[in-house]
Amino acid sequence: MGPVFYTSLPRDAQTPQGHGTSGGAARRRLVSILWERLVAMDSPLWPCRLPSGRDALPIQVVRDPLGKPHLLLGEYRGPAISFTQGGGAVWAALCGDESDIGIDVAEADEFQGDYPFGRVFNARELQHVVSLAGGDVGKASALLWSVKEAAVKALGCGFHLVEPRDIHVHPAVMGDGEYTFPVRLSRKALERLPLGAGRSIWVRSLPQAKTWLSIAFVNWQCR
């Protein structure tokens, strides 16, 4: 996995004029913040020069036919970017290399009562994540859902082409208070998304107050 930059802004942040920040305005600000971080790093992993300051090209967020966003630098394709909302904030993640990226945030409160766990999660993956969450099913479900949602965003299909149970989340590697999950697609999902066959899909998950933040990476060069 290459470098990734992520940050958030409060969904209802006040602007200097005293007006609330809309989701669209927050996203534009997030793009500017993350772009400046990428430029400052002067990443050797991005294949083109990263302009800034007076030499900067106009930056747009454009989407492919399935809705997967990436930056457009003038007429040149830029790095992948992803957005999500949760916990009262708008989040964005920008990839520092040519990988695709997806971000998601989920809260435990979303997974209570009669939530259809069996239609969304496979028994083995849920059991593993519940053990990571100390037996808290709601917290574990938020973590697992954020992993799956981030993965399909990085693949660029969302849940239009695959079902949640077709995203298989394997046991995590833990380090520095976060988890890294390898993710694979089921055979059924690969029939609909053959480009995903053998691809390297990794999801990094971090606790954020009452939410889980997950960022997925898909490297189309690696199998």
Where are these regions (language model features)?
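Core catalytic alpha/beta fold that binds nucleotide/phospho-ligands
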Residues: M1-R223
